[in-house]
A protein has these predicted regions:
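The feature encodes the CheY-like receiver
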Residues: 29, 72-73, 81, 90, ...
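Charged docking surfaces used in two-component/phosphorelay signaling
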Residues: 30-38
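Short hydrophobic/Thr-rich beta-strand motif most characteristic of the beta2 strand and flanking loop
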Residues: 40-47, 55
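Active-site beta3 strand of CheY-like receiver
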Residues: 60-67
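Short, glycine/charged-rich "phosphate-handling" switch motifs in NTP-dependent
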Residues: 115
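C-terminal output helix
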Residues: 122-131
Length: 140
């Protein structure tokens, strides 16, 4: 009898399927991490923009990035601008998310280089759809 364990159930290898997630709200960080891990991704979490910045300086190997727009120390758009200025990080697609209702935040995020924008609160299905748009291929 051959049984498949969790490590081999996804079509793609989990190696190379890493996403950095930064949000200063611990509940949102846990929620997004849980959803992405169920999709087969390895998640590297950061509690704020400064922590995400430090991670990105030493580790450029991410499939995608998901950042809150408004965070202490370094904002989401500031992180995206940093990524777009670094050759080794330029190709990582970025999703921005926020609970703020100010339309300027989404336009600032896109101007910085974000690919998709997800308003909070969101459903699991909405996050999955935006992730597929972000990465540009189906996760089936």
């Amino acid at each position: 009898m051959v049984s498949k364990d969790d490590k081999t159930t996804t079509k793609d290898s989990k190696e190379g399927r890493r996403i950095i997630v930064a949000d200063d709200d611990p509940a949102i960080l846990r929620l997004v991490t849980t959803i992405l891990e169920k999709e087969g991704y390895t998640v590297v979490g950061a509690r704020d923009g400064r922590e995400a910045y430090k991670i990105l300086q030493t580790d450029p190997n991410f499939t995608a990035a998901v950042f809150d727009v408004v965070m202490p120390h370094v904002s989401g758009p500031e992180l995206v601008r940093f990524m777009k200025s670094e050759k080794r990080l330029q190709s990582i697609p970025v999703m921005m998310m926020t609970a703020e209702q100010d339309p300027k935040l989404s336009s600032d995020s896109f101007a910085a280089g974000a690919v998709v924008f997800l308003p909070k609160p969101f459903t699991t299905a909405q996050l999955q759809t935006m992730l597929q748009m972000l990465i540009g291929k189906s996760v089936s």
